[in-house]
Amino acid sequence: MKDYFKRAANAALRGAVIGAAAGSAALFLIAPGSSTKRQRAPFMGTNCAHRGLHSRDKSVPENSLEAFRLAAEAGYGIELDVQLSKDGQVVVFHDDTLDRVCGVHARVDELTLSELRELRLCGTDQTIPLFTEVLDVVRCRSAIICELKDGKRNRELCEKTYEIISDYSGDICIESFNPLIVAWFRFHAKDLLRGQLAQPMRRYDADTVSAPTAYALGHTLFNFIARPQFIAYRIGFRPLSVRLSEYMGAMRVGWTSHEPRNEAGRDTVIFEFYKPRVKFK
């Protein structure tokens, strides 16, 4: 009988040790990086206009200089997207392809800046802007969340984007869906607030992202690579791993909001198609 209880106790102890090790490993994977109050302050309680203050009827196109001007004048923060043209210019544009916004069947990275300049956004007189042109329009009036789009020249995009940011005196942070892009800033730009964009597993493109990778991305299991200081998660259900990361200190950023109630429980909100208050905390 004593041997039975001894074996049971040993088995329970082994189970506890294994469970503790597994729990520690999981926490290691999802733990965020630390950030300072100064880094967080411009974005805390801030409503950021998604791709600028563009309009539903497209009379003010997304990611246009006019959309960014309107957002800055209203006092909102700004979210925007950067990627490279064929000739290595950092341009502000969301999609990989030009079909939806410009009506041209081509990829952004297949055209030079001069070729992109000939296109119009949503049939208006607005053109695809350079990142530097957007910063010239904003003039340090808005906190900017800069998303780096995943592509074939990520290192070049990171280097050129950071070079531009380094010459700007306004408040900017970066984010990306690709943890390796976020990790580049972890090791090369420690002064810059960085965030991991994520969404539920089912939202990733099954044609380009495998199921295991989509699961890991959706549960922010690559945080150990980038140690993001905020998690920008699609508004809706957030898995336990994301909530634990937030509990451990990651700023809570939600996208894309279409109603003011999404401010609840978040530190920063990325919104579109309505005009919320500028600051909510």
Model feature map: region roles:
Residues 2-281:
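Phosphate-group recognition and catalysis centered on beta-loop-alpha active-site segments
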